[in-house]
A protein has these predicted regions:
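Beta-lactam-recognizing serine transpeptidase/beta-lactamase-like catalytic domain environment
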Residues: 4, 10, 14-198
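Ligand-recognition elements built from short beta-strands and adjacent flexible loops
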Residues: 55, 116, 152-155, 169, ...
Length: 368
């Protein structure tokens, strides 16, 4: 068969041309970097009973077959925390650091009693190499063609990489295939990472695919969509206030795929829970409906059962600040559009207090 020919680094990380890379650097160099990134020892996290079980080939055990399988992550057993510290080293300028649970301890007055500083264990790669890795990882998520696109969340610069491996030391599935581990690691902001989101799925049940980009990446994207605003992670700098988005048709789409489509468009999502709702099922109803023109950041309520449209009561937000009114409406399952002075107080609302409206409805508040 005809091969791919020469490929760039972005294509290499997307389609995993790692066996050739392993062959080129050789067994000793491969092991040296494997060790330098912390995969042969505990991370040193300040939690009790960190496991010391790690499975890997040492340099003198890496024959051609072992090197080939190790090069794409098939022949070793490591912990999720080891993976997180290694990814951090790859994108933070090249430094392997010891993870900590507590950043600092303060007294009741907010005075810092003890602060846990960064414990740099060693520099693994150069700053320039780390910068190149960040760019490649951002390309994987943001270019719209690789599997990393399923972790994309509009408004954020995200870098990421998927990983799929077989559990060779476990009993096989009933179909005779090996059990799989599907994972995805993301960092953001990609130009100056502050957080890592790592999701590892242990042989997902009832999955129609083994690809991590279709299994773990959407979960990462959904976590980012909730965590990034809460932590105040810097956005990509583009002002989207006043932007109008068209709601896509999600009926018949699997729940996980629906979430991805909304993340890409800059819309939030909420599963309208009932006794029979299932996150693994397909969407049967949505509100706002497909084709609706809504503000960037609007929440779309999705249903995975036959119940069409839960209702909620509109709270009285008159006299409240715009921010507090927005919070009250959100807590009631409603979207909010602010007209007038966004720093003022609510003078009027488009739906009367106490009215019963469909969950996900847009309430316009006029502030002054």
């Amino acid at each position: 068969e005809i091969g791919s020919g020469l490929v760039g680094s972005e294509m290499c990380i997307r389609d995993s041309y790692y066996i050739q890379l392993g062959q080129r650097i050789g067994s000793q160099t491969f092991y040296d970097y494997f060790d330098a990134f912390g995969f042969t020892s505990r991370t040193g996290v300040d939690l009790p009973s960190e496991t010391n079980f790690m499975q890997y080939y040492k340099a003198d055990q890496l024959g051609e077959v072992q090197l080939a399988s190790s090069a794409f992550g098939q022949a070793m057993a490591i912990t999720p925390l080891q993976m997180c510290t290694a990814v951090a080293a790859a994108v933070n300028g090249g430094y392997l650091v010891t993870p900590h649970v507590v950043d600092k301890i303060t007294d009741s007055n907010g005075n810092v009693i003890e602060e846990v500083g960064a414990n740099v264990r060693r520099q693994v790669i150069s700053a320039s190499t780390s910068d190149a890795i960040r760019q490649i990882m951002e390309y994987e998520v943001g270019n719209g063609t690789g599997g990393g696109k399923y972790a994309y969340v509009s408004g954020y610069r995200i870098g990421g990489k998927s990983g799929t491996s077989e559990q060779l030391n476990m009993d096989r599935r009933t179909d005779g295939d090996y059990k799989k581990v599907a994972s995805f690691a993301a960092v953001l902001p990609a130009d100056d990472p502050e957080i890592i989101v790592y999701v590892m799925l242990d042989d997902p049940n009832n999955a129609k695919t083994d690809y991590s980009s279709l299994l773990a990446a959407p979960v990462v994207g959904n976590i980012i969509s909730e965590v990034a605003p809460y932590l105040g992670i810097a956005t990509d700098g583009e002002d989207r206030s006043g932007t109008t988005v068209t709601v896509p048709n999600l009926v018949g789409t699997e729940w996980s795929s629906a979430q991805v489509q909304l993340n890409i468009k800059g819309l939030k999502h909420q599963l309208a829970e009932s006794e029979s709702s299932q996150t693994a099922a397909a969407v049967t109803y949505q509100y706002p409906h497909a084709g609706a023109k809504v503000a960037y950041g609007t929440t779309v309520y999705l249903y995975t059962d036959t119940y069409e449209g839960q209702h909620t009561e509109v709270p009285d937000v008159t006299g409240k600040s715009a921010d507090f009114a927005r919070q009250m409406l959100s807590a009631a399952g409603l979207n909010c559009v602010v007209e007038g002075d966004a720093n003022g107080t609510v003078q009027a609302q488009s739906e009367d207090a106490g009215a019963s409206v469909q969950r996900g409805s847009i309430i316009t508040i006029t502030c002054g």
